[in-house]
Amino acid sequence: MNVRRVESISAQLEEASSTGGFLYAQNNTKRSIKERLMKLLPCSAAKTSSPAIQNSVEDELEMATVRHRPEALELLEAQSKFTKKELQILYRGFKNECPSGVVNEETFKEIYSQFFPQGDSTTYAHFLFNAFDTDHNGAVSFEDFIKGLSILLRGTVQEKLNWAFNLYDINKDGYITKEEMLDIMKAIYDMMGKCTYPVLKEDAPRQHVETFFQKMDKNKDGVVTIDEFIESCQKDENIMRSMQLFENVI
């Protein structure tokens, strides 16, 4: 395969994977990213235009009889980078999609597949679900969702890269191995589907993994640490640019 083409595809994949896959689109603009997020939470596009509606949403948070009772708005506001009003809007959309107050993995996969109808996002959504499910109980609560979204949208570069590393580190042992990276890359290629037209060779994911490790495995010990990952990403203009696209999309 042409070396320049591999490098170009690698850059696209790094942008997509380093930000949870939300960024990959034909036109990676703040508007297109916002549209994707609103598609995930359709009711979040509705404005809480009056105090009565705002109070209604707040009452839902405090008095809900759903299976999972979310934390108080004030606590979530302190733990995230969203305002109280933004949390009210996001909760309305979340509860509309997930009346029980939590999202299981199958529902998460169904929702996420809307982002990538041209491919198969099932495996990548599994990895992404595990990144949001921080307490590993098999469900993503509103709190889990908000904390992850807060990092992706408004976190510092360091926070976003830590989140991305955790996504790659499948077994959570503090290292990214070639096997883990290959699993992630295969999932991303499947997810992107027609976006990789013309169709790439079967060994393309493995080639991307080799490129990734040549760039990031500084001491050549066969694994990538969090420090190596962050240092390499901070020197990559494409990845840094993709991080900025997330700012203020809500």
Curated annotation (Swiss-Prot):
Annotated ranges, domain EF-hand: 61-117, 120-155, 156-191, 204-239
Annotated Gene Ontology cellular component terms: cytosol; peroxisome; plasma membrane; voltage-gated potassium channel complex
Name of the protein this chain belongs to: Kv channel-interacting protein 4
Natural source organism: Mus musculus (Mouse)
Upper taxonomic lineage: Eukaryota, Metazoa, Chordata, Craniata, Vertebrata
Pfam families: EF-hand_7 (PF13499), EF-hand_8 (PF13833)
Binding site for Ca(2+) 2: 169, 171, 173, 175, 180
SMART domains for the chain: EFh
Domain notes: The KIS (K-channel inactivation suppressor) domain is required for converting A-type Kv4 current to a slowly inactivating delayed rectifier potassium current.
Membrane topology per record: Peripheral membrane protein
Chain positions covered by the region annotation KIS: 2-44
Binding site for Ca(2+) 1: 133, 135, 137, 144
Record Gene3D superfamilies: EF-hand (1.10.238.10)
Region of interest called Interaction with KCND2, as start-end residue ranges on this chain: 237-250
Gene Ontology biological process: protein localization to plasma membrane; regulation of potassium ion transmembrane transport
Record family assignment: Belongs to the recoverin family.
